[in-house]
Amino acid sequence: MTNLRKTHPLLKIINHSFIDLPAPSNISAWWNFGSLLGICLIIQILTGLFLAMHYTSDTLTAFSSVAHICRDVNHGWFLRNLHANGASMFFMCLFLHVGRGIYYGSYLYKETWNIGVILLLTVMATAFVGYVLPWGQMSFWGATVITNLLSAIPYIGTTLAEWIWGGFAVDKATLTRFFAFHFILPFIITALAIVHLLFLHETGSNNPSGINPNSDKIPFHPYYTIKDALGLMLLLLVLLILALFSPDLLGDPDNFSPANPLNTPPHIKPEWYFLFAYAILRSIPNKLGGVLALLASILILLIIPLLHTANQRSMMFRPISQTLFWILTANLITLTWIGGQPVEQPFIIIGQLASMLYFLLILVLMPTAGLFENYMLKPKW
């Protein structure tokens, strides 16, 4: 008798995705982040659902309702800390997942990669609208500054900004719709993640060598289920340490003050995971130029497959490209640091140089390195 998991219409899909899936035998821990992102999404949806049961999306009561969750709801403080720090873990895994894709040439699975970039943008949008909900000072002013960027769009900008606000400034209507967006977007992310997996399973996983692994595959279960379980334990350990011991480490102290439209905080800045893009935005002294650079800093990921010039897929055996990749990583860390600093020298010039280097590395230096490595591989005699 055939096993039920191989014949049942629903179980068959699960079986082909997580049990009998043929996986390359040599994929490293860098391939753990896909499953970790799935776990992060589940944690965020569950904690978010319970928080939404007690939250009120009204300007007069939003801040108080968050305080009420932390003080009066059973384990409400824990749910809130898990949700806030879960977002940080989500982005940490996202950045490592994208970095892995760039390093090992996974972007050559174009459909999977493009859906992944759309996923990244959707998660960023979700995190942004979510940050506004507690209605603290940084929530309010962050929303004001970022939504104001829409007004830089020629001709329709101001109308567009007012349409998003539901009035002439960030107010009650904005908070209500942001709560609605924050509730619906994770389910859209879940649907996109399923499509992402669907396209990935059309081709199968890439592997560190970048060579076609079809001749050497092993079943996903038990080999990679146990490997993913280890990653999950480490993720939960870090998340619990953050949520239980220093829940406010990655937050902004200004958000402990209720939103006040009459008092601007000295340094308006988003959460740490947006700082690299915020630094690129601020490094251009023109509003529209800054907005375009901000968009380009993320959308540039879409053209990475077109910029692949090397004969080898992975960077595993390409030392020059490796060096440039780690310079890019250091550059992004520098941009993250600059995004959190005030707009004054020497931070302005460092931010401008780092922003320039970011685009230069991706658009010019890395494709050139690929061509040079091709030349070096050719026999010279």
Swiss-Prot record:
Organism (species): Pseudantechinus woolleyae (Woolley's false antechinus)
What is the designated name of this protein? Cytochrome b
Annotated membrane topology is:
Multi-pass membrane protein
In Pfam terms, one family for this protein is Cytochrome_B
Which GO terms are recorded in the biological process aspect for this UniProt protein?
A: mitochondrial electron transport, ubiquinol to cytochrome c
Location of the protein in the cell: Mitochondrion inner membrane
Q: Give the highest taxon in the source lineage.
A: Eukaryota
Q: Which CDD domains match?
A: cytochrome_b_C (cd00290), Cytochrome_b_N (cd00284)
Keywords annotated in UniProt: Electron transport, Heme, Iron, Membrane, Metal-binding, Mitochondrion, Mitochondrion inner membrane, Respiratory chain, Transmembrane, Transmembrane helix, Transport, Ubiquinone
Chief subcellular site? mitochondrion
Q: Other remarks on record?
A: Heme 1 (or BL or b562) is low-potential and absorbs at about 562 nm, and heme 2 (or BH or b566) is high-potential and absorbs at about 566 nm.
